[in-house]
Amino acid sequence: SLVVPVIIRKFKRFSEWRNFYAIVGIISLAAVIVVGQVSGGAMLGFTVAGINVQPSELVKIVFVFFVASSFKMSLEFKNIVATTALAAFHVLILVASRDLGAALILFVVYLVMLYVATRQPLYILAGLGAGSAASVIAYYLFDHVRVRVLVWKDPFATYDSGGYQVAQSLFAIGTGSWFGMGLYQGMPSKIPVVEKDFIFSAISEELGGIYALCLILICLGCFMQFMLIAVRMQAMFYKLIAFGLGTAYIVQVFLTIGGVTKFIPSTGVTLPFVSYGGSSILSTFIVFNVVQGLYILKRNEEEEEYEAE
């Protein structure tokens, strides 16, 4: 990932690979359905040479490049419909594999990129309507979605039938209070999958609410920096990439922290740069380095313009 900024600056033809991005994204997600392993009621990844790979983490990046290259190519209604259909296909594959957290991230990312490219609020309203209808359908179609909604409503009433994880998460956050129990003094092992989906609860318990709030502020600071870089980019392709990757990052942070604090139903996504998981960490490194490459590219362009004057 450290060479990504150099590649972004030196190679100028990323915007021409729309079909390649779509094919790679769809095949990678479809492979999970064919050979994926079930974890927590969802097919999230598969094992290659003893290494667990979660394609959806890397496909989020490829998806952003696909949408950006497609909108850079044309903003005609026909192309928007075709792009929307392919984007929806990505989301439907994730829904079929029951990776609803990643599906929601791609959905929000697409809506944001669509608005940035077209500045048409009607598209956003149509997308929100379709998303609301899809949420209702998912509630009645998938048992584990209904369970998560019930757990979100009252995790203590469903303590023995799915609410244990969220209930223990709330206990851990409450136990840590503002200053925490101390490093290694908590009992995060009482929360299932604490090192991935519920790492924020362990941090709150051992290091306290103040430290947890600082972590949230760091995430918000990273997002704001993404948005500042996106606003400064003149080329539509690069602007869309920065907006898309920044949106994917902050939505993932929101879903993770919101799920463990019972603000929203748990979606099973990881906290970038914090949760355990090779695919998650690698994809986050790539995201940050792509945006860094865009920043360096913009800075070099400004320096060249200044020297030309």
In which residue ranges do the predicted regions lie?
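Hydrophobic alpha-helical transmembrane segments of multi-pass inner membrane proteins, especially
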Residues: 1-162, 201-261, 286, 290, ...
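Arg/Lys-rich, often Gly-containing low-complexity segments of ribosomal proteins
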Residues: 41, 175, 267
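Transmembrane helix boundary and interhelical junction motifs in multipass membrane proteins
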Residues: 99-104, 180-183, 194-196, 213, ...
